[in-house]
């Protein structure tokens, strides 16, 4: 592995151990801010802390040259910038680390910095800031989690999601900052990859200027809507969103625990596929920058760009970004868990990168939504007659059982069980004749083609939920478990929201 590959795999995540002591004199004569020959670097996107644990935290910022634009990418030829991290137990920094931590901002990561600080005390409030020559960031604060075995009386947190730049709800962030919170949870859609789309019809706040994507890519069949395609596009969106002072203030005051949903990549996405066109067009022959292809075609480069930008701009205590395999779109693993004493256990999942395709194919005509001009992309993915939804789901689960059966050697004990299940399903497709044990196997194996978590993550999630001894178990879940049903006068059938999965929901409830 050469140096460049090592840097890619390392993903610029650095780590240090906090050692507090005498920080030295704080004379104004020695303050680099007062030395005129030094550059006054800027930190236009503020500061962030993330994933508080009893002894560690992830700290983030982005630094730019005094003459650089706040949002444009740092030129790739730009030299590295040395940044000093200062951490204290007081807001005045009278009790700071004995020696500030030296970090490096690199142009290849758009001068973002992501640092894990360890050796901290549990249930303790800390303050931090960054310096680059004569430039100083705003002061941020965070509170570490209680010790794992601590008896915790209360935990104060807020959760948020779906912060579309074009919708006038950002004033709520100002109110949130006034609360005494331990941390904030973000359940995804931190950015929206589209701008000017049909669902973004609300009046834009006066504080928000127009979004203009660097690549100027347009959504298929909608020349007015811009979409993010390149790494530069996705980086632009994070920087644009974080230019809002209210969001910066929230991040500076509280640590963040974040996952993504679909819009960090593409609306209603699954794995590396978008669903803008319901499978009706294919633009893969066009060169980039372009409007993406239909959901029947993999968009690995675009998915990798979205992953990279999220990793660079959304601090989280996760494994390093791994881009060494050029054809791999699963370059980052964001699902993880955090515990807050004996009181609460947060299990955060990723329901986009590993999920199977939607149960009902996007290109299928949906009898429940005949007027596509009115309902647009709602189509087959959202409002589906319940019996149709169930039949298609059952068919996919049976196909998964058959695939598992055929892959097992004759000597495997599970092959007999799967064979028995398949035999019964030939005459009873509903599975009503299955025993309780056979139904459990059917549910577990059959989820392979309909799961939103994927097998590995689903088993991890199940183990966390079953073994957790916390009083409260919180699932950081970006997709609602509630079923949405409508009794349409034009149709006698009850329709269900296609995102739900009754089999999976029943299993989930048994773990909680």
Cite the ranges covered by each PLM segment.
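Metal-dependent phosphoester/phosphodiester hydrolase catalytic core
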Residues: 3, 10, 18-19, 29-512
